[in-house]
Amino acid sequence: MKRIPPSFRWTVLLALAAIACPCARAQKHNVIIFVADGLRRGSVNATDTPALYMVRKTGVDFDNSHAVYPTLTTANASAIATGHGLGDTGDYANTLYPGVWLSKPDILAPAGTIAPFLENDEILADLNSAFNGNYLGERPLLSVAREQGFNVAAIGKLGPTAIQQMDAVSWNDLGNITSSGAIIVDDSTGQSVGIRLPQEMTDAMVKADLPLDAPSRTNGFGDTSQWNNGFHGDAQTPGTLDANRVQEQWFADVTTKVVLPKFAAESKPFVLLFWSRDPDGTQHNQGDSLQNLEPGINGDTSKRGLQNADHCLKQLLDWLDAHPAVKANTDVLITSDHGFATISRREIAGDGTQSTEVSAALDYAPAGTDKPEPKGTLPQGFLAIDLGVRGHMRVFDPTVRATAGSSAYQEVQIGGELSHYPGNETIAALLGDTVKKVDGSDAQLILEGNGGSDLLYVPSKNPELVRKTVALLTQLDYIGGIFVDDAYCPAATDCPGALPLSAIGLVGKSQLPRPAIVVTFRNFKMTPGDLQSAKQISDSHLQEGQGNHGALARDQTFNNMAAMGPDFKAGFVDDAPMGNIDIAPTIAHILGIEMPSVGTLKGRVLTEALAGGALLKPDAEKTMVSAPFKDGIRTVLEYQELDGVRYYDRACLLTKATATHCP
């Protein structure tokens, strides 16, 4: 018998091993996640956003997508980062109550806050210091990928970008914010308050002739110029007329001239997230529609924001086109953190009906650089004012320390010739007889304002106070839905007029204090069924006619999502419910990464959108209705469910006994 050479036997064995384990020969793919902050699905078209439109048409079009609620940036950033719902991550809103006087380690109390705005690197580092080095409690996908040998980077808008590698962010002994070698580039890069970049990144930026300091949003103009994208105007002065051009271009250049070339040269698989501030920032601040509902966020300035985000995506896609070997191995996933609506500060319905609450009837002394607003305007902090009046509670401003008296915070004057309102650009309030403790824990209610929704905390955990507050909320004409902590209302019928927080995924394993009550404000459409025409009551310093989000309304839960690349189907429309919570599980599946978990509020792998994946049959849309309060007032929640994951469409407060669905 002819003897088989040993070298040939080894060749056969290696071939058989490769067949038995395809993973041994498969090259790991790359993933680019592009987040267009505040992009509405209906804003994407071939003319204004050709790059976004191309991905939708050539790859997978997710036409039943969802943001998590509240529809806010850092909340959805936490879901995108971890694949967990907010009940697990604790990032309930952009502004929340941390339960402690939050300050930089070893800094005296006056430097802290109990109303932190999370789009801030220092605040995020403070939260990590207060909550075991990672306030999210869940591991971000990018951090896990980096540990497993992937190159990773997060680039873009301040706040949500750092959240993508949150467990790497901390204060060092010198009082600087470090990232343990992680690449995080945002608005604060290069500043003393920013996250330090690895030395190799700064060297590469110098070599690429790029500034080491991130540009501001001014576009090179003065603080009050309408060409400054950060200028929001006031009640009598229109806001910006331009997109965030200069800063966004710098982010795109850092990505395509430094980060992607670095990754390509190192020949390692990578995960890159780019978070475009536009169109969000431009829609917020646009000056096209001062004190008018039309054109609102559908005007020319908002369109410039759309075009700016699309320009950034095109620059990334052009780089891939110029590097075909990388492109062939790279998936691109597009999302937005939430939708958007035009702010209404007076009208509560499409027929022009205005709010009749006390807060809208008072005259106010403008704060800071504000100017007097039109009669009948709901001021910022209107919910705190109305609860204070109806509940016979004093209102205190947690952003201003008292200079006299026994209270730790300045009281907000309500009534008299001119009233005041709480907060400035950060809207928060403490309600009660007095508040002597700096952490606010002796207040009856703590309110954190977040645009289309507000969070209410009850430090005493008094169930009678919670029920009393729910009763007050049901009587306010601008309320669009009420949700109460399961500790007080575990079932849909336990708190008349309200549903439990677990119904919207806000009860989980979070380390942070959970709100006792979450309210969403009224939302209406000027054209029935047209999400682009949506108007939103908003607890905000911004004006009627500008833009905001945060509510549980379909114009804000319906974000924009699409994907293309070797792991995704081509030319496929996915009508199954899905959303931001599914991004991390899907990418982890594609890359072969095992994600650790603490909580169980997890998204699903989007198998139906992957190459070779079977189609899924979605369940019928579902409705949950609370027990009625007096006059039949009840909260209605409309949602979808698939593979045990809930996707929230809208909520409303119904008063007609015959109505069963939100208008």
Regions found by a protein language model. Name each.
Residues 480-517, 575, 592-627:
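Polar, surface-exposed loop/tail segments
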Residues 85, 91-289, 447-459, 465, ...:
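His/Asp/Glu-rich, glycine-adjacent segments
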Residues 28-41, 54-56, 80, 145, ...:
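Beta-strand elements within well-structured catalytic alpha/beta cores of enzymes
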Residues 42-95, 151-155:
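Short, structured active-site-proximal loop/turn typified by the sulfatase FGly-forming signature C/S-X-P-X-R
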